[in-house]
């Protein structure tokens, strides 16, 4: 059984069973890490939304906005962390306060008040935090930073995301990017050692919900062993 075939079948299962809501993105939102996975860089640039499955999600982002001052100033907020549950929500948007002046920017950096608004127009219940500089000093990547953050007892820690291995993501400008999140209970499988193929299959199997796992097992039993 080829890994590509099985991975493709799992991806199809996920596309129908897991993706349940859309995180709307605006130009001033610089998405850095989603559910422990790196999202920054040119691969994400231009995407206007991010598809997430039903369950808990954690995002690390910055607000970057050119201020209409003379001369022009590019405001950049500290890294912000927010955790929310996407259950029974079709879309989520990050609602920022007005940031048009340096004073607005300083105020937001000091006290970053923002909301996550669901498709019903009401704010979601969230946990939020600001990533402090001491978290950044000893880490080489943002994935490493968030893994260390998530094993600690902080306001927006999600221990399940500390064990997720990194994976590449891509986006086409103006389109969406599918991303898996956490469904409770969450299980993880580390990818290491010689039998990476088997462990990768285990990892993706454990990310699926129980119904998807049952469907996959039924399908797998019908496949010939080569």
Swiss-Prot record:
Membrane-spanning segments: none
Keywords: Signal
A Pfam family assignment: DUF2057
Signal peptide start and end residues: 1-20
NCBIfam families named in the record: PRK03641.1
Family: Belongs to the UPF0319 family.
HAMAP family assigned to the protein according to its UniProt record, in alphabetical order: UPF0319
Protein name: UPF0319 protein YPO1442/y2728/YP_1333
Organism listed in the record: Yersinia pestis
Organism lineage string: Bacteria, Pseudomonadati, Pseudomonadota, Gammaproteobacteria, Enterobacterales
């Amino acid at each position: 059984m080829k890994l590509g075939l099985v991975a493709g079948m799992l991806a199809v299962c996920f596309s129908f069973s897991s993706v349940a809501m859309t995180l709307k993105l605006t130009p001033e939102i610089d998405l850095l890490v989603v559910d422990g996975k790196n999202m920054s860089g040119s691969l994400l640039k231009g995407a206007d939304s991010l598809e997430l499955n039903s369950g808990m999600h954690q995002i690390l982002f910055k607000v970057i906005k050119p201020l209409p001052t003379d001369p022009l100033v590019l405001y950049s907020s500290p890294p912000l962390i927010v955790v929310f549950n996407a259950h029974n929500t079709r879309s989520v948007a990050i609602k920022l306060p007005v940031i048009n002046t340096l004073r607005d920017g300083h105020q937001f950096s000091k006290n970053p008040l923002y909301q996550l608004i669901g498709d019903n127009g009401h704010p979601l219940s969230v946990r939020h935090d600001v990533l402090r500089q001491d978290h950044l000093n000893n880490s080489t990547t943002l994935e490493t930073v968030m893994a260390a953050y998530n094993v600690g007892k902080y306001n927006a820690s999600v221990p399940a995301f500390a064990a997720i291995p990194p994976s590449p993501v891509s986006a086409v400008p103006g389109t969406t990017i599918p991303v898996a999140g956490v469904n409770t209970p969450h299980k993880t499988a580390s990818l290491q050692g010689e039998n990476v193929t088997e462990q990768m299959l285990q990892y993706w199997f454990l990310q699926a919900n129980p119904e998807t796992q049952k469907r996959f097992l039924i399908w797998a039993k019908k496949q010939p062993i080569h």
